[in-house]
């Protein structure tokens, strides 16, 4: 069992990173705080990812589909599917990205 504070997690780029393998959990999570115009490059993971948008607006591409999402949106991304998001709003984008793996694996395209 672990009790953690978000500020105890590593902050890399634009996200606090929860690595499940370090906590005995079967998943990993990113707590995203992206400034306008920010987002990762097009990439894939060998597992499902679920993005929960908490605040802000993003343009999300999953495969050939591009949509605008905002607070309350949930995006389910199949394994090995190219995807990315960019903060397309004027304020901060906050989202929680759940990775169905205790170890984070990403291939940038």
Across the structure, where does each feature detected by a protein language model lie?
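Short, charged, solvent-exposed linker or helix-capping segments at domain edges/interfaces
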Residues: 107-109
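Short acidic-glycine-tyrosine-enriched beta hairpin
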Residues: 64-79
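Structural motif
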Residues: 57-59, 66, 82, 92
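Short, conserved beta-strand element in jelly-roll/cupin
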Residues: 33-35, 44-60
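Ligand-binding loop in jelly-roll beta-barrel domains
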Residues: 79-105
């Amino acid at each position: 069992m672990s009790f953690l504070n978000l500020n105890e997690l590593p902050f890399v780029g634009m996200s606090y990173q929860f690595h499940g393998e370090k906590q005995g959990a079967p998943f990993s999570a990113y707590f995203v705080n992206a400034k306008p115009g920010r987002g990762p490059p097009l990439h894939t993971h060998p597992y499902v990812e679920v993005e929960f948008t908490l605040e802000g607006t993003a343009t999300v591409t999953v495969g050939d589909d591009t949509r605008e999402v905002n607070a309350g949106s949930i995006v389910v991304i199949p394994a090995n599917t190219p995807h990315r998001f960019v903060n397309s709003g004027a304020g901060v984008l906050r989202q929680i990205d759940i990775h169905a793996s205790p170890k984070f694996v990403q291939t940038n395209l």
